[in-house]
């Protein structure tokens, strides 16, 4: 197991210095070249249709303790792409032999994302910045974008809004949301956006709306009412997220299929907020059974009719199916794209 826990540099070699990495340990360039575009017989190239996203809350820790169970889930679901958030550090060898992996990391053991893509699928390009023309990675390794022939796949780990404006977290989140809005307004292909988006859009997306709406840290109340409440459930965040969906013409795949509130399996996060100012025992008890849906698959409206399933894989307040994280995996499956119909032959 030790061989997995080595940071990798941009060329894929182990490195003691932490840095953003775009490594494919199984060989091949960091950013894939042009796809073949077909099978040689005029048919379009096969593209991924089954996706899994998971905030692992440290991939290293999950591999040490919960990996066999998670590996069984992956084997059973057989996703074409696995998107992971909060990896903290890269692994020198991919834990999934049939997948190639791309990493984007922070300079410290914080945040970071990974994207595992089955080797039979060839992305045209992989980027690590919302500005896809930039060669730089996003701060803290929060973005990976894989471009396929007919769509873009975006994996993000959104910054937490935090509790206090004085810590600049509100401003950081506002800037992030502004950049995401600009991105979705200008994408040139249908989009599949997944990851820990750190926001619950509607009251149906949290287990206890009144609790989260009135949540405070050590009694502190932000001066702006729009910033009050649990990070991820403040009026300002929810409003901005709704605008991103509207302006980007995006569909929440899970809510598209699941219209009713599911108190057992309709949430992706459960736990207590982490912070130096929080008394762990008091807050862990207070937050027991309090859950939020903050992990998503959002798809462009052009893809809405292809949604086959979108499921949460965690259940109950005992966090069955969370695999040691405070987030559970979420999956999306699309149907095959309908080939363009052949022109009707004129009748004799």
Regions found by a protein language model. Give the residues of each.
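Structural motif corresponding to alpha-helix initiation and N-cap regions
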Residues: 64-68, 140, 238
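Surface-exposed cleft-lining segments at the edges of enzyme active sites
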Residues: 130-136, 158-180, 225-230
């Amino acid at each position: 197991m030790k061989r997995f826990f080595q940071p990798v540099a941009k060329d894929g070699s182990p490195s003691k210095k932490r840095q953003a990495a775009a490594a494919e340990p199984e060989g091949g360039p960091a950013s894939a070249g042009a796809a073949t575009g077909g099978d040689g017989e005029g048919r379009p190239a096969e593209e991924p249709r089954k996706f899994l996203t998971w905030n692992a809350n440290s991939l290293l820790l999950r591999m040490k303790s919960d990996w066999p169970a998670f590996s069984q889930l992956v084997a059973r679901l057989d996703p074409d792409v696995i998107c992971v958030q909060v990896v903290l550090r890269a692994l020198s060898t991919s834990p999934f032999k049939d997948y190639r992996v791309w990493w984007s990391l922070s300079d410290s053991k914080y945040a970071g994302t990974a994207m595992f893509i089955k080797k039979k699928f060839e992305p045209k390009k992989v980027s690590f910045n919302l500005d896809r023309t930039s060669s730089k990675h996003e701060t803290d390794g929060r973005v990976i974008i894989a471009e396929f022939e007919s769509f873009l796949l975006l994996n993000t780990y959104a910054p937490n809004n935090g509790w206090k404006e004085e810590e600049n977290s509100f401003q950081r989140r506002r800037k992030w949301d502004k950049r995401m809005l600009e991105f979705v307004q200008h994408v040139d292909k249908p989009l599949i956006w997944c990851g820990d988006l750190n926001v619950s859009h509607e009251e149906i997306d949290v287990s206890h709306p009144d609790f989260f709406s009135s949540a405070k840290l050590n009694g502190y109340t932000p001066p702006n009412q729009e910033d009050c409440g649990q990070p991820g459930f403040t009026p300002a965040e929810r409003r901005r997220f709704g605008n991103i969906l509207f302006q980007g013409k995006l569909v929440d795949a899970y809510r598209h299929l699941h219209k009713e509130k599911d108190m057992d399996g309709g949430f992706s996060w459960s736990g207590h907020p982490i912070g130096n100012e929080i008394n762990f025992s008091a807050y862990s008890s207070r937050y027991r059974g309090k859950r939020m849906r903050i992990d998503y698959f959002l798809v462009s409206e052009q893809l809405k009719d292809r949604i086959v399933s979108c499921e949460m894989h965690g259940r109950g307040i005992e966090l069955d199916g969370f695999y040691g994280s405070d987030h559970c995996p979420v999956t999306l499956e699309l149907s095959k794209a309908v080939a363009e119909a052949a022109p009707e032959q004129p009748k004799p």
